Regions:
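Non-catalytic tandem-repeat scaffold regions and their flanking low-complexity/translocation tails
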Residues: 19-134
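Bacterial N-terminal signal peptides
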Residues: 4-14
Length: 134
């Protein structure tokens, strides 16, 4: 019985930390900036992102229908994911070619954080959790 309690404690301690540490652990600078903007919920922070597509994607997620628009995104998968999430249309997620982006899209549109665990890319998995923690 005592051994089971230690295993339970170890399992609890290994659970993902809160969203703040999620962003800090992201390697790619633009993805980290996007994560921080999403975490703070401030579309103004999206302006710090160097990548044109990620800047627009970030802004569209935080302020749909305002300054940024998913249709201005050049990358096809990013544009499709943006449209699906902003419109909460799970069927649009199926049109995304990248498996991880498709999984992230489904998790966010379904508001099912447990689905983030199925994403292979660690940075995308972290961003998925941050989006769903807002």
């Amino acid at each position: 019985m005592r051994h089971s309690l230690w295993l339970l404690l170890a399992a609890v301690l290994s659970l993902p930390a809160q969203a703040g540490t999620e962003c800090r652990d992201i390697h790619d600078r633009d993805l980290r900036r996007m994560c921080n903007a999403l975490e703070r919920g401030d579309s103004g922070d999206c302006g710090d992102i160097d990548s044109r597509d990620l800047r627009r994607y970030c802004g569209a997620l935080l302020a749909p229908g305002q300054r940024y628009d998913c249709d201005d995104i050049r990358d096809g998968d990013t544009r499709r994911q943006c449209r699906a999430i902003v419109r909460s249309d799970r069927k649009r997620c199926d049109d995304i070619d990248s498996r991880d982006m498709r999984r992230q899209c489904r998790a966010v549109v379904s508001r099912a954080s447990w689905q983030c665990d199925g994403i292979d890319d660690r940075d995308m998995r972290r961003i998925c959790r941050v989006i769903l923690s807002r």
